[in-house]
């Protein structure tokens, strides 16, 4: 039986930490940043954090190959 593949979209969006938690990136920081104020962009620089346990279970299932 072949190896299971990771869900490539999930592999690009989530990272597993050493403790096993799953980190994600925050939204609204990708493009069209010129119309956002400096204050808004500064507040968006804060780390987005980890997934909730119910979502982390789903993400782990998608990341099994990576």
From Swiss-Prot:
GO terms for molecular function: structural constituent of ribosome. Pfam families: Ribosomal_L35p (PF01632). One of its GO terms (biological process) is translation. The keyword Ribosomal protein applies. Residues 1-48 are annotated as: Disordered. Coiled coil: none annotated. Keywords: Ribonucleoprotein, Ribosomal protein. It comes from the Bacteria. The keyword Magnesium does not apply. Residues 1-44 have a biased composition (Basic residues). GO terms for cellular component: cytosolic large ribosomal subunit. NCBIfam families: rpmI_bact. PANTHER family: 54S RIBOSOMAL PROTEIN BL35M, LARGE RIBOSOMAL SUBUNIT PROTEIN BL35M. Belongs to the bacterial ribosomal protein bL35 family. This is Large ribosomal subunit protein bL35. It comes from Legionella pneumophila (strain Corby).
């Amino acid at each position: 039986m072949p190896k299971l593949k990771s869900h490539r979209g999930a592999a690009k969006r989530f990272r597993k930490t050493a403790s096993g938690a799953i980190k994600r990136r925050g939204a609204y920081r990708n493009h069209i940043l010129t119309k956002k104020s400096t204050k808004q962009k500064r507040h968006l620089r804060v780390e987005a954090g980890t997934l909730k346990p119910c979502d982390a279970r789903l993400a782990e299932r998608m990341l099994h190959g990576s």
